[in-house]
């Protein structure tokens, strides 16, 4: 059994984790320190900040608190198994299985284990739409990338990871109480 250590001091095997292993503190900390796009951006922009932008777009569209929370947590598995860029991830079917198992634990932990197909499609849609805006803004050579209009203005400024982690926790705790 391979054990990982998390920021909060938890120790568990990520290949056999359960919802009790999930910690909001660990998610916020790790996601705020992981750079999007494999680090090939104009400056550091975290998975945590991306997740906050997705959640704020869901809120601006008037979507349910459950969908807003799902948007905030949609990349949370990356806190435990890091991020792999889409062009590579598409060739790693085993990664998808592991990611899915971990996401099930995370969604179960926060009461989202019963998301409907429509609710899941909404957070996936926003993930793609925000990604297009991020690519246009943060990657060299993508300035002319076509993007869909958003209801919000994503914050893609360079942010301190501690501020992102704190905001992630505040938003998550509020949504958990309200959903």
Predicted regions and their residues:
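Metal-dependent phosphohydrolase cores
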Residues: 1-179
């Amino acid at each position: 059994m391979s054990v990982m250590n998390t920021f909060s001091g938890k120790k568990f095997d990520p290949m056999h984790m359960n919802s009790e292993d999930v910690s909001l503190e660990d998610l916020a900390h790790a996601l705020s320190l992981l750079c999007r796009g494999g680090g090939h951006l104009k400056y550091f922009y975290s998975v945590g900040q991306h997740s906050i932008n997705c959640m704020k777009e869901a809120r601006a569209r008037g979507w349910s608190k459950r969908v807003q929370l799902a948007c905030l947590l949609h990349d949370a598995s990356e806190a435990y198994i890091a991020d792999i860029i889409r062009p590579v991830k598409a060739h790693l079917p085993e990664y998808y299985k592991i990611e899915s198992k971990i996401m099930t634990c995370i969604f179960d932990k926060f009461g989202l284990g019963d998301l409907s197909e429509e609710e899941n499609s909404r957070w996936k849609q926003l993930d793609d739409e925000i990604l297009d805006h991020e690519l246009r803004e943060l990657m060299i050579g993508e300035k002319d990338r076509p993007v869909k209009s958003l209801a919000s203005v994503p914050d893609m400024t360079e942010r301190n990871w501690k501020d992102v982690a704190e905001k992630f926790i505040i938003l998550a705790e509020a949504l958990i109480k309200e959903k």
